[in-house]
């Protein structure tokens, strides 16, 4: 069993215990108490899966947390601020674009658009987004550009459905890449996106997608137009 899995469970058990003590003093509001109940069920399930006793894990988690706090400075307790990263210029973000063969898909709170008339092109994906804890926090806009600078695809949040995770963005990127590669385009991802939103890429910044996944993603986009 992976040691990180065990220690993560131990710390989660102890932190749940701290939150329970807080609730016992009638200090928690309704959402706090609701999360406490849901997390209790989750911890029981994880304990059964791992074969670990919750009480024993709580004691071990307490030792881990105490050790961390002994080494912690007041400066480290500050909540890190988000960073805004930009691949695109203001002109690239605001520029209008036209699709000869428009394809569109809504994936959760993200809208994926692409022009399936584009064939045999070298395409790069660029994005502007915020980052926290070295992971993508909020996507502002992602666009696909040809070497000539033409926009041929886009991923943007839907204003009516706010909120998305880095995993949502990664899945949307995969769908866009699959649709573009279906027409024999070569797609690569900017270094910034590779680092924070799409970690599984080859040396050229081109995410490896098996042929069957490319076909599935392309068909998915087509079926939802």
Curated annotation (Swiss-Prot):
It is found in: Host nucleus; Host cytoplasm. SUPFAM superfamilies: Ns1 effector domain-like (SSF143021), S15/NS1 RNA-binding domain (SSF47060). Residues 218-225 are annotated as: PABPN1-binding. Keywords: Eukaryotic host gene expression shutoff by virus, Host cytoplasm, Host gene expression shutoff by virus, Host mRNA suppression by virus, Host nucleus, Host-virus interaction, Inhibition of host innate immune response by virus, Inhibition of host interferon signaling pathway by virus, Inhibition of host PKR by virus, Inhibition of host pre-mRNA processing by virus, Inhibition of host RIG-I by virus, Inhibition of host RLR pathway by virus, Interferon antiviral system evasion, RNA-binding, Ubl conjugation, Viral immunoevasion. The keyword Ubl conjugation applies. Residues 175-210 are annotated as: CPSF4-binding. InterPro entries: NS1 (IPR004208), NS1A (IPR000256), NS1A_effect_dom-like_sf (IPR038064), uS15_NS1_RNA-bd_sf (IPR009068). A motif (Nuclear localization signal) lies at residues 34-38. One of its GO terms (cellular component) is host cell nucleus. Gene3D superfamilies: Influenza virus non-structural protein, effector domain, S15/NS1, RNA-binding. Homodimer. Interacts with host TRIM25 (via coiled coil); this interaction specifically inhibits TRIM25 multimerization and TRIM25-mediated RIGI CARD ubiquitination. Interacts with human EIF2AK2/PKR, CPSF4, IVNS1ABP and PABPN1. Belongs to the influenza A viruses NS1 family. The dsRNA-binding region is required for suppression of RNA silencing. Inhibits post-transcriptional processing of cellular pre-mRNA, by binding and inhibiting two cellular proteins that are required for the 3'-end processing of cellular pre-mRNAs: the 30 kDa cleavage and polyadenylation specificity factor/CPSF4 and the poly(A)-binding protein 2/PABPN1. In turn, unprocessed 3' end pre-mRNAs accumulate in the host nucleus and are no longer exported to the cytoplasm. Cellular protein synthesis is thereby shut off very early after virus infection. This is Non-structural protein 1. It comes from Influenza A virus (strain A/Chicken/Hong Kong/YU562/2001 H5N1 genotype B).
